[in-house]
């Protein structure tokens, strides 16, 4: 006769998110001791997680939250889109995000050590990975804490949770334009805020490339400086947010749009699942 009750099974399932039969079997093995059953399930989960260690995590979701003058963006990765849209995985992302926000973490390392109930975030993820049967990883964390923040989460498929997430740090009062800039970032994928933020070695590498291309095209030597600068301007439009043509009106640059709205963009973060 089993020396545990249905309430014990429910408690175990609630605490670890384990399946019904896994919970029952663990309680049988633990002779009804819930704490021992938890350790049994965790040990089995760790063994399974170790086997999954080298697997790719190209699916998942992004999630974000704004609280106490700061916005936090995370990417939680898994192996398949089947798990990415699973309610347990989505609930895990919510728990992870809440713990990361509460801890004020701004890096993956800090986030993994953040308290999550009686566990750390790292342990919580490990437990849920064992239940879901896939490798799960907290891939990225960003925290912005300027004057104001705007969050935009984009679904690339109606069947999946958000796959692209953006947080914009800004000063000013035009929240509508700030949200539009966040949407632009999701679409245009800038790497830097301004041209001055692009590393010098990257600019010089691009300069060398466009110089060689221009010479190979047989451009007159006297015209090369102007041609090269023009092509570098195109490069800056690709990588620097403020230099880009505004997605909603390509006759204006993002810089002109934010200036007209009385905004100053002070930073941003953009995560795309698997990218």
UniProtKB/Swiss-Prot annotation:
Pfam families: EF_TS (PF00889). The keyword Coiled coil does not apply. The keyword Flavoprotein does not apply. It comes from the Bacteria. CDD domains: UBA_EF-Ts (cd14275). Disulfide bonds: none annotated. GO terms for cellular component: cytoplasm. Coiled coil: none annotated. One of its GO terms (molecular function) is translation elongation factor activity. Keywords: Cytoplasm, Elongation factor, Protein biosynthesis. Residues 80-83 are annotated as: Involved in Mg(2+) ion dislocation from EF-Tu. It is found in: Cytoplasm. HAMAP family: EF_Ts. Associates with the EF-Tu.GDP complex and induces the exchange of GDP to GTP. It remains bound to the aminoacyl-tRNA.EF-Tu.GTP complex up to the GTP hydrolysis stage on the ribosome. Belongs to the EF-Ts family. This is Elongation factor Ts. It comes from Clavibacter sepedonicus (Clavibacter michiganensis subsp. sepedonicus).
């Amino acid at each position: 006769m089993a020396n545990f009750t249905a309430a014990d099974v429910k408690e175990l399932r609630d605490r670890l998110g384990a399946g019904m039969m896994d919970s029952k079997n663990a309680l049988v093995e633990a002779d009804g001791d819930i704490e021992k059953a938890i350790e049994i399930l965790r040990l089995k989960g760790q063994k399974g997680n170790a086997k999954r260690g080298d697997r790719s995590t190209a699916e998942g979701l992004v999630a974000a939250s704004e609280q106490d003058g700061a916005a936090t963006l995370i990417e939680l990765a898994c192996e398949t889109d089947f798990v990415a849209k699973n309610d347990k995985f989505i609930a895990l992302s919510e728990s992870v995000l809440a713990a990361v926000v509460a801890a004020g973490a701004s890096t993956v390392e800090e986030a993994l050590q953040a308290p999550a109930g009686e566990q750390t975030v790292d342990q919580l993820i490990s437990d849920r990975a064992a239940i879901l049967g896939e490798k799960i990883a907290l891939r990225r964390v960003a925290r912005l804490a300027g004057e104001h923040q705007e969050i935009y989460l984009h679904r690339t498929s109606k069947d999946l949770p958000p796959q692209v997430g953006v947080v914009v740090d800004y000063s000013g009062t035009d929240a509508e334009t700030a949200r539009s800039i966040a949407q632009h970032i999701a679409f245009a994928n800038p790497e830097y805020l301004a041209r001055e933020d692009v590393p010098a070695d990257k600019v010089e590498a691009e300069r060398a490339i466009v110089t060689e291309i221009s010479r190979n095209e047989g451009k007159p030597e006297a015209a090369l400086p102007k041609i090269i600068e023009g092509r570098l301007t195109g490069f800056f439009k690709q990588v620097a947010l403020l230099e880009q043509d505004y997605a909603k009106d390509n006759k204006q640059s993002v810089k002109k749009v934010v200036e007209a709205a009385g905004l100053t963009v002070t930073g941003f973060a953009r995560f795309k699942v698997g990218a």
